[in-house]
Amino acid sequence: MRKLPVLIAATLAIVPFGPADAQTRSGTSVLMAESERGRQFQEEYGFSDAVIAGDTIYLSGIVAGLAPGETDMKAAYDRVYRHIGSILKRAGASYDDIVDMTSFHTDVEAQLKPMSQVHKKYVTAPYPAWSAIGVARILGGGITEIKITARRPQAAADSRL
């Protein structure tokens, strides 16, 4: 049934997350979802919110989906950018620390403008590198999936000493 995967994807995009839950993995820190439901989903599929390796933060792809009855893509993108911000914060970074972004779109031409409008609300110049790619489908019926790479500001400052 298609409604359940959409609900799961939409729920994961808006579930609030608390402080970082770091686990050691060969010299890296792994951030898992704080909510039981989010953690179960991640454990079922074998992924985390983010991995911190040295001064680099790798966020897993985060799915933007329309809520039931919703037609405004900006609302979906606003939810996903807030989620991205919460993960970055848990990793010790902010939107200013994003260095690379890849977005996967089910309709890149229709989705790029509303996403860009929301993107600029959170990410200011100088902008990170960004690749937007068209795809046939996204897990759970999502409209866009966003993958982020960021640099931890303290680690960057430490490397200059």
Residue ranges and their predicted role:
Residues 4-8, 17-78, 82-91, 96-99, ...:
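N-terminal presequence-like segments and the immediate start of the first folded domain
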